[in-house]
């Protein structure tokens, strides 16, 4: 399936990193003011926070393609495989050649009736007034949460329904709740979240007592523990957990 979410340019969202509310159309430019420029990171992190789902990859289109909306771009790519080559050489991306190939095959194989488009302006945004009296379109958090769970749930994670516990092993509050939202919207079965005994963990890790690594375990490891895939922790609170998968968050999880 292909899910397309249209977010009006005038939508205000909280920019990741504590920069306050900005129009989504301005978030990339805000990030580009950093040294070094971080426009893509600002935008992807802010969208991930807004929708409550992980964002694994991006394509930044050049001016020859950026005037196409998402539906037009997909139709353009499906018309001719050569157009995928044009996309590769006329965009910047964090996807490698193999991932771009898989994207091409995936887009080309999806039936037209399996492409779903949702415009947030229809029923997910509210007209509001910011403290400085600026008129703004703000998201309805409850509706966005329901939408994200519906659109972005991973069918395999949802089917496995393994119990997942989340531990915050840092002194920064709120990390476990943020991770729980991401995992739940992917269809994960989060049974609890709490602070670990350890409070200075650098790299996050994902642990399981099972010798057979499940799809859910591998997906969460790629999401949270790219820097620590064979790590372990001596922590009394974590070791008492009866969850099938334990996600232990370190300082690298922002």
Where are these regions (language model features)?
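Non-catalytic, solvent-exposed segments at the cell envelope interface
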Residues: 1-254
């Amino acid at each position: 399936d292909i899910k397309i979410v249209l977010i009006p340019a005038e939508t205000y969202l909280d920019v990741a990193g504590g920069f306050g509310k900005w129009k989504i159309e301005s978030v990339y430019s805000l990030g580009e003011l950093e040294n070094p420029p971080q426009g893509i990171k600002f935008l992807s992190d802010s969208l991930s926070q807004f929708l409550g789902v992980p964002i694994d990859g991006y394509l930044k289109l050049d001016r020859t393609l950026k005037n196409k909306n998402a539906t037009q771009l997909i139709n353009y790519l499906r018309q001719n495989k050569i157009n995928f080559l044009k996309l590769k050489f006329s965009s910047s991306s964090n996807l490698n050649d193999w991932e771009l190939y898989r994207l091409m095959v995936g887009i080309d194989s999806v039936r037209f009736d399996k492409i779903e488009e949702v415009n947030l302006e229809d029923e997910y945004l509210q007209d509001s007034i910011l403290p400085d009296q600026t008129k703004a379109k703000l998201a309805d958090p409850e509706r966005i949460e329901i939408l994200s769970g519906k659109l972005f749930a991973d069918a395999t994670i949802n089917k496995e329904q393994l119990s997942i516990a989340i531990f915050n092993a840092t002194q920064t509050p709120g990390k476990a709740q943020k991770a729980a939202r991401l995992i739940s919207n992917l269809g994960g079965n989060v049974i609890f979240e709490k602070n670990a005994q350890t409070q200075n963990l650098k790299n996050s890790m994902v642990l399981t007592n099972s010798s057979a690594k499940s799809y859910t375990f591998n997906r969460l490891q790629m999401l949270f523990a790219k820097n620590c895939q064979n790590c372990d922790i001596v922590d009394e609170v974590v070791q008492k957990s009866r969850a099938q998968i334990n996600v232990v968050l370190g300082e690298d999880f922002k």
